[in-house]
Amino acid sequence: MGFIWGDGYITNNARNLGISVHIKDIKHLEKFKDIIPFTGKIGIYKVTSGYKIGSEYSRIIFSSPKMVSDLKRHGLQENKSKIMKPPVDGSIPKEFIHHFIRGLQDANGSICGFINKYGKNIFYTHFLGTLDMLEYIKENIKFETNQKYTQRYENCPVYDCRFTMSKTNLWILDFIYKDSTENIRLDRKYEEYLKIKEFFN
């Protein structure tokens, strides 16, 4: 459900649910199709406006008033990008909240690494969202209360919460990947997590 919270959207008078991802993550939509199940096609399109004009993305959209109604009951909003709120209290059992957060991370976060100019390996992960969403993540992961959020640009309602990964805070990724299975996680980010885990172990 976290992935839908991040990359999904409600259309057509709350009857249709759509999910759009970068073309490189099309396999994740194929997994979603298998779980629903959904027999329609995954569309491939090109961005025509904004700062990624020409880049390709994949999308599925289908009519499911029941699913949309259930998601809205849990707190998903239409036109949510700038006003996204956490799920309604109690709508996600405590033992599944880390799966929800991982879905958000798969949709709107990143896990990556690079070698800096001094030849040192640097790894980081970050969560992206409204202040309400980041506070929800902080409350449930229970990371440091003084962790700072960075506004993406002036007057933007979306903020970034970034961690430079180390042996002492690898538990953050361990937590969100706990009990995850291949059919529900984004392969590309999971592989990055394994690389970081191997490096620090």
Language-model features: where?
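Internal intein/HINT superfamily modules and their associated LAGLIDADG
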Residues: 1-201
